[in-house]
Amino acid sequence: MRVGIKVLGCPKNEADCEVLAGVLREGGHEIVFDVKDADVVVLDTCAFIEDAKRESIDEIFSFVDAKDQYGYKLVVKGCLVQRYYEELKKEVPEVDQWIGVADPEEIANAIENGTDLVPDQPETVYRYRKRIDLEERPYAYVKISDGCDRGCTFCSIPSFKGSLRSRSIEDITREVEDLLKEGKKEIILVAQDTTSYGIDLYRKQALPDLLRRLNSLNGEFWIRVMYLHPDHLTEEIISAMLELDKVVKYFDVPVQHGSDKILKLMGRTKSSEELKKMLSSIRERFPDAVLRTSIIVGFPGETEEDFEELKQFVEEIQFDKLGAFVYSDEEGTVAFNLKEKVDPEMAKRRQEELLLLQAEISNSRLDRFVGKKLKFLVEGKEGKFLVGRTWTEAPEVDGVVFVRGKGKIGDFLEVVIKEHDEYDMWGSVI
């Protein structure tokens, strides 16, 4: 059977699908990269917020429309199916098979048998199997846990991903060792909340132990940690990230807001002052540390005063990178039942205003790198430039660096930064 896989949504989905591809190949199936060549197309979906759901549904219909032309069987899997299985099955009968959130081996067996698979509640997290690159790139996302126990009032993820389930340090290490042997130069650790890693398995926050283990592996590579929940970003985690040489000093901390009133409504426990103190302490210890965050605007009850507090918070912290999202009213969450909904047009205006403010801040923050030498990872070529990233950018969510010089994908080069705009930098190989 020839199987094509299309991934939507977050990096955790990408990691899942590369593991699934490996399981399918171990079972004797061929992984193809063009749907025209596939007997079966697996579409992995996202259901986090309204925009992601809409994109997933649009892609489902796009693949349904192409079925007759290419003659493949269509399997739709992932978070959207786990959350809306009965509705989807009724509304889109053209889909051949529906699969929710499950273990890769269970998914592979279901695909082979042609049966739907939607667990009542996801209870497993995959054990490492040899994975297959679905894209040529020098980095890999490694999922260290699945599910979440945090209970943010705006978030629907626990309802379809289940409670926290951590992989063992040994299992993750085996996966990373294989990825390094294959030539990966950056290992990006992902989860719904990386700070919670190990609480279920080791009865403690085990991220520092995991980082120390991975840092001890041989080779030249970066370790990047994403999705650090601010309420549980401890001094031990911060110290490990700052002290270990292969861990990049990049802190992805989704604070979500800067108004104490809104933070409380969101179910967050740290106040804005506590957040400022924590983030400032990182910069005091490592001035060039990169701080990235995510913000939700238009949360129920957000007034102009709250929004002004948010802007003041952002200006004071001076985040290097910031993603701003309009609140998505998700059925089944605590926030769904909150009154005082913000007008969508008002929320959109606030998003645009915040992003304009952040563009100025990002531009100013990049000034410190002009004239500096930075390690650069080659990811491709665009015209006369090599394209890639330094340790200061995460893939897909941040800007890129354009460099004049010679190199190939996966090379680490030393470059000097010459100029920048709000998001991207330009330099040359030394």
Curated annotation (Swiss-Prot):
Source domain of life: Bacteria
Catalytic activity: L-aspartate(89)-[ribosomal protein uS12]-hydrogen + (sulfur carrier)-SH + AH2 + 2 S-adenosyl-L-methionine = 3-methylsulfanyl-L-aspartate(89)-[ribosomal protein uS12]-hydrogen + (sulfur carrier)-H + 5'-deoxyadenosine + L-methionine + A + S-adenosyl-L-homocysteine + 2 H(+)
Binding residues for [4Fe-4S] cluster 2: C148, C152, C155
Binding-site residues for [4Fe-4S] cluster 1, renumbered to this chain: C10, C46, C79
Enzyme Commission number: 2.8.4.4
Pfam families per record: Radical_SAM (PF04055), TRAM_2 (PF18693), UPF0004 (PF00919)
Cofactor(s) it depends on: [4Fe-4S] cluster
Listed PROSITE patterns: MTTASE_N (PS51449), MTTASE_RADICAL (PS01278), RADICAL_SAM (PS51918), TRAM (PS50926)
Entries under PANTHER family matching the protein: RIBOSOMAL PROTEIN S12 METHYLTHIOTRANSFERASE RIMO, RIBOSOMAL PROTEIN US12 METHYLTHIOTRANSFERASE RIMO
Family label: Belongs to the methylthiotransferase family. RimO subfamily.
NCBIfam families: 30S ribosomal protein S12 methylthiotransferase RimO (TIGR01125), MiaB/RimO family radical SAM methylthiotransferase (TIGR00089)
Protein name: Ribosomal protein uS12 methylthiotransferase RimO
Highest classification ranks of the organism: Bacteria, Thermotogati, Thermotogota, Thermotogae, Thermotogales
